[in-house]
Amino acid sequence: MDLHKMQYFKDVYELNSFTKAANKNFVYQSAVTQQIASIEKELGVLLFEREHGKIVHTQAGKIFYQECRDILDEYEHVMEEIKNHSSYKVQTQKKLKIGF
C-alpha cells in the first residue's frame, strides 16, 4: 500500500464520493475506484458499502480512515520539518558564464 492509495481513500471518505475524490486528485473516477478495490482486497474487508449510488462507510472503513489520516498528517509534518532545515536543502542555483 502506498500514500497515494491512502490519500484517495481519505478523499473518498471525506467527500463521500468517488467522483469528487477523483476530481480533487486530477484522475479518472475509475482510477480511484480501482485503488479502493485494491485496498479492500489487500485488507480483506469492505471499506465502503455501495447502496443506490451512495457510499456508506463500514466500521472497518472508519478505523482505516482514522489511521490513514494520522499517517498522512505525520507524513506532511515530516516533510515540512525536513524542508525547514536549511542545512539539508539541495542547492539548485547554477551559474551561467557567457564569454565574448
Q: How should each PLM-predicted stretch be described?
A:
Residues 15, 24, 38-46:
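Residue cluster at the C-terminal edge of the helix-turn-helix DNA-binding motif
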Residues 84-100:
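Interdomain hinge and pocket-entrance segments immediately C-terminal to HTH DNA-binding domains
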Residues 42-43, 64-89:
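Alpha-helical linker/hinge and terminal dimerization helices associated
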Residues 40-57, 80:
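A short LG(V/I)-centered, amphipathic sequence patch enriched
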